[in-house]
Each structure stands twice: as C-alpha cells, then as structure tokens.
Regions:
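NAD(P)-binding Rossmann-fold cofactor-contacting core
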Residues: 1-14
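Adenosine-phosphate binding glycine-rich loop
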Residues: 66-171
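Active-site catalytic pocket residues across diverse enzymes, especially alpha/beta-hydrolases
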Residues: 10, 48, 152
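A short helix-to-beta-strand connector/capping loop
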Residues: 14-18, 125-127
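Rossmann-like adenosine-cofactor binding region
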Residues: 16-102
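Anionic, Ser/Thr-rich low-complexity intrinsically disordered regions
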Residues: 33, 171-172
C-alpha cells in the first residue's frame, strides 16, 4: 500500500509513470537505466538480471570493503570509469571482480573523458550493456562547488556563515 501511494505521488509530482515492483529482480529486468548509490558491502542486484541494452551507473561502493555490483555485472558490461587509477584502487566491487578473476583491469574500456573527447567509442550497439563506475574525483567536486558559489554570489543568493567551532556549536539543533 505504501509503495502504491508513493508511486502515485511520484507520478503526480513529476509527470512520469511510476509503479511499484514486487522485487529487485523485476525492477532491474524492466529498467533501461539502473543507478546504484549505496554503501553496501554486498551486491544489491545480480548481473544476470540485466537485459541487453541496459546502462548501469554504479556511483557508490567507493571504498575497498564496499561492493554494490557483482562480478557478473562487470563481466557483461562495457566498463567506463571516471579516473582509471583511482577507480581501480578504491572501487571495492571492481577490485573484487578483478581479484576473483571475473575480469581484468584491462577490461576497463575507457575513462569517461576519453569517450566525451571521442578518443574511445561509447556504446557500440543497442544490445550492449554499458557500465559507468564512479568513485568521484575531488577536483571536480571543488570546481563544481566553486561554480555554484560564484553563481550564488553573482545573484545575491545564500547566507554568510562563520565556520569557527563556537558558531557551529550554537547553530546545532
């Protein structure tokens, strides 16, 4: 009942069809896009559930002990990462797939920048399963924060805050 109410609310609010699924398997099998953003220590779905043509964005599991994607997901996918060296060191699920021998580091097809600049091919055909594995790049976060800050200042938005310990203690709810 809660899931149906939430689906109705989301449909109304965003003007898209939202409907509850009976299982993670059903959800994954019926999705063109699967996004995971978890701190899970074990896979949240099975790669065998993915249909041809699906895109997976795995943006969690950003530490060696975490694993939101299974080896089968990596094995079946064209793998793209944000920054190869960092992802190979930090993405627990990718590291697990490599250490289990399901894939090798050479199976990482490209960095996202290589696809954007045309140095590497993206999706080769409509049946290919693609996977973007991201652990985040701090310099991109800083650049984004600086851009947002500059835009807010230019538009007179936001509020000044002191960041000393006393101010922070007094502002706690």
């Amino acid at each position: 009942v809660k899931a149906e109410a939430l689906a109705a609310q989301l449909s109304d609010e965003y003007g898209v069809e939202a409907r509850p699924a009976s299982s993670a398997r059903e959800t994954v099998a019926q999705s063109d896009l699967v996004v995971t953003a978890t701190t899970s220590r074990e896979p949240v779905f099975r790669g065998e559930w993915l249909e041809e043509g699906t895109h997976v964005s795995g943006i969690g599991a950003n530490a060696p002990a975490k694993q939101e994607l299974d080896g089968e997901t990596f094995r079946r996918s064209k793998i793209v990462v944000d920054f190869r060296e960092q992802t190979l060191q930090e993405a627990g699920d990718l590291r697990e797939a490599i250490s289990a021998g399901v894939i090798s580091a050479d199976d990482v097809h490209a960095e996202l920048g290589e696809i954007i600049t045309g140095r590497k091919e993206g999706r080769a055909n409509s049946r290919e399963i693609t996977l973007f594995k991201s652990v985040g790049i701090a310099v991109e976060d800083i650049a984004t924060a600086a851009f947002v800050y500059e835009q807010a200042m230019a538009k007179g938005l936001g509020a000044q805050m002191a960041l000393d310990g006393e101010s922070l203690r007094n502002s706690a709810v």
